[in-house]
Amino acid sequence: MIAAIVDVGSNTIRLTVYQYEGQDTQVLFHRKTMAGLVHYIDKKRMSDAGIRVVCQTLNDYMSMLKQLPVTPDSIHVFATAAIRNIANTRQVVDAIRESAGIEVEVISGDEEARLSYVGAMHSVELEEGVLVDIGGGSSEIAVFQNKEICYSDSLPIGCLNAYEKCVEKIIPSEKERQAIAELVQKQLQAMSIPELGPLPICGVGGTIRASFKLKGVLGETDQANQMSIEELQGMIRRFKNHKKKHIAPILVKTPDRIHTLIPGMILLNEIARFFQSEVVHISRFGVREGFLYDRLAKGSEEK
């Protein structure tokens, strides 16, 4: 069976076409657009320009899908923080329906965390830990024990809106780094997270994968899709100014994240500090794969 899944996020809009049979999946096609929807949100409303960006991107994706063996009923579109956390959600969803002819499911923060967990557990073997998915406009957290979620929540801060709120230029200054860290710690302290002692992190999403890629560019030893918090902190210290020779590794590996990667790594470091984590296990799969396994593949197995 074939399914197309579109994830409308705060920083990126991603289209992935999968071929699947039960739990066996293969990616047939992938496209990413750096839409930066957070830039179009002011006073909790997405501007008309932002709505046009979403609609145009989705129309482009629908045109691509017409060239692929994908039927209309196998196209699934969901949105996360960029559309979930605004006052004019209904306006955006209606505009997408009228422009692109598709329905968008706006998933809650808890559901996003759960689906990210479902996807990640098909890539990482952990009995207990904390799943962390750092997006552009929010960061999802799911604490799990014995392979069951015991707590999940959504921090209303991601790598892109952290940059928007706290950073003036491209690379955050020491003062701006501290502002991001304090913002994250304040939000974490406000949550009713159970105290379970030190937990490993299962890292999901583009920010964490990009951090791991950057570690490789810097010549750090590849430890089977793992990154120590010590390595993460070393990278944060390394990128402290705007000189080209200092930021060259980011430009080489993840140029489209030049402004959001350091804020994202600071976010990850503060979450790790909160959970006393020493290592991040990098998952290849995340919320889109979780959506596929939970909503589609499971149903095909039951038929």
Give the location of each predicted region.
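Short glycine-aspartate micro-motif
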Residues: 3-7, 129-133, 201
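Dinucleotide-binding Rossmann-like beta1-alpha1 core, especially the glycine-rich loop
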Residues: 77
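N-terminal basic/disordered segments at the start of proteins
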Residues: 1-26
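Ser/Thr-glycine-rich phosphate-binding loops at phosphate-binding pockets of nucleotides
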Residues: 10-12, 120, 135-141, 206
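Helical "lid/coupling" subdomains associated with nucleotide-phosphate turnover
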Residues: 17, 40-67, 72, 80-92, ...
